[in-house]
Amino acid sequence: MIDETLLEGEEKMQKAVEVAKDELATVRTGRANPAMFSGIVVDYYGSPTPLNQLASISVPEARLVVIKPYDASQLGAMEKAIRDSDLGVNPSNDGQLIRVSIPQMTEERRKEMVKLAKHKGEEGRITVRGIRRKVKEEIDRIVKDGEAGEDEGTRGEKELENLTHRYVAQIDELVKHKEAELLEV
């Protein structure tokens, strides 16, 4: 019973790390990256649609992103959505595709992005700790109801702590990697 609870908790922690990884991918570095456009939503015939579902996004050069829409009539809406996003980039539209050149980031902007990356990492850590709390409550309930012994409960809690430390360390590693990427000039 406790092992099943731990397994469920571990799966949720893995998902939390994946979410943190995806969130960190959206933090802009000085390099072009298709993932930075994943949070952009375009008004497509009245319904909000993610940009990556409306166009192919490629990176032909380190500081250039090319967005080729599947429906050329949506170029203007896509360009507006990119311009209005918090990426701080200026797209250019040539009638067929959108080119976005990624400007060199200022030192101040880099520090802002590092702060944002740390914040997203902290959100991931909070999620993992919340999962730990729920799993611990479930283990305590199992022991209290007599479905497992005290020793099993203690072993389960130790295992839970190890899982928590492992997944928090993974998130810390992702943040550290992102920070190094941001501060690299």
Curated annotation (Swiss-Prot):
It comes from the Bacteria. Keywords: Cytoplasm, Protein biosynthesis. It is found in: Cytoplasm. GO terms for cellular component: cytoplasm. One of its GO terms (molecular function) is ribosomal large subunit binding. Pfam families: RRF. GO terms for biological process: translational termination. Belongs to the RRF family. Responsible for the release of ribosomes from messenger RNA at the termination of protein biosynthesis. May increase the efficiency of translation by recycling ribosomes from one round of translation to another. This is Ribosome-recycling factor. The lineage of its organism: Bacteria, Bacillati, Actinomycetota, Actinomycetes, Pseudonocardiales.
